């Protein structure tokens, strides 16, 4: 399995290793599992928000554009509707040869909850390529955490999909935000051996079979043991 994890998917068309995977037969499956339950709560919401015909609230083309720019044919893009698609159909779509599975932004805990709810974890583990954006970049790890922002009142740790161990990913990092540092400290106290990748917008990490093979505009934090619990920036804008 190869994972492309990023804060914003617009950078995908600039990642040569990603573009090299794509041809006219490449298929994209969008799993809209991350959205707030008041935003998408029924089949009609999926159809409306992912309508290919223009409407003020459709996010289909904005969601698909980075993949189309990277070379995917729009006709090869499928949006899963968990309210109408049966599980056998979803599993078939996810595991076809030459298929990219996309986990979009939103709420990472919702991704995990829905994948478990629809009994898709073993299927997800069989996927060849997964792209995770924002919330979707956090869910693949054994554990992930959120920190205080407009969506969360405070730090909170969640169990992830356990596709990758020994590390975790934090998107949309601005180094001037004091909450990210305190959240990193709290997480490292609980999980000392875990590497934390903090990606600015445009940053990404590529992981293949549990090994990091590519990194760009990402800060990596570790626990400094000899001087107590503190966070130290050890990699900055490594290309």
Predicted regions and their residues:
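Short amphipathic alpha-helical segments and helix-helix/interface helices
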Residues: 19, 64, 91-92, 117-124, ...
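Flexible gly/pro-rich beta->alpha loop and the following alpha-helix that scaffold active-site loops
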Residues: 72-129
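Structural motif
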Residues: 29, 100-104, 131-132, 169-170
